[in-house]
């Protein structure tokens, strides 16, 4: 939504408000195989040798592995299963290297991703859906890495006062979307100024 643009609204300690357009997102895709065009584009991106890193912020719950999803084979519905399916496409394209980076604020976030991806890959090998070399590929840290990261700034949900201020300034299409999972997205991000 929002033409892949966002407005950063920086709330300074002096009471000043600084606004900047964030235009670094070039494409938005739904990571769901039932959206066939979006999924085909994701496969194309994962098969591209120029891809060096993927990152996501999905909350700690997003790293879960459910037995029922493991049994779905190469058509998982959970996020980590989808990441593993896309890594399999990268494997088939030449065992290309990739950094898989969690941006979630949880302890050992890279290990959570690695554990989930390895679980899917191992199950798929056991089911005879992928070759054992795929599991070796995602376990080879010279090919696929899952680094830890520390996030020191959490972006709050869209603030109604900031939304009203922007509307008063003439900022149109200033609506907040609440997803099925009760997460919030808006065409603006409100945050306090970095203190250090």
Where are these regions (language model features)?
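Substrate/ligand-engaging "lid" and interaction regions
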Residues: 1-196
């Amino acid at each position: 939504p929002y033409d892949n643009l966002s407005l950063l609204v920086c709330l300074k300690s002096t009471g000043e408000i600084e606004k900047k357009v964030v235009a670094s997102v070039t494409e938005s895709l739904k990571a769901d195989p039932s959206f066939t065009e979006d999924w085909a584009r994701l496969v194309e991106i994962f098969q591209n040798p120029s891809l060096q890193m993927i990152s996501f912020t999905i909350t700690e719950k997003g790293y879960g592995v459910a037995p029922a999803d493991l049994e779905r084979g190469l058509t998982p519905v959970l996020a980590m299963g989808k990441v593993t399916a896309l890594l399999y496409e990268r494997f088939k394209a030449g065992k290309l290297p990739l950094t898989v980076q969690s941006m979630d604020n949880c302890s050992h976030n890279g290990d959570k991703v690695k554990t989930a991806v390895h679980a899917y890959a191992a199950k798929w090998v056991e089911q005879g859906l992928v070759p054992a070399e795929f599991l070796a590929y995602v376990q080879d840290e010279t090919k696929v890495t899952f680094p830890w990261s520390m996030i020191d700034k959490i972006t709050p949900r869209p603030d109604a006062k900031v939304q009203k201020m922007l509307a008063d300034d003439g900022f149109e299409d200033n609506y907040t979307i609440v997803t099925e999972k009760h997460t919030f997205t808006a065409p603006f991000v409100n945050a306090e100024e970095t203190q250090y």
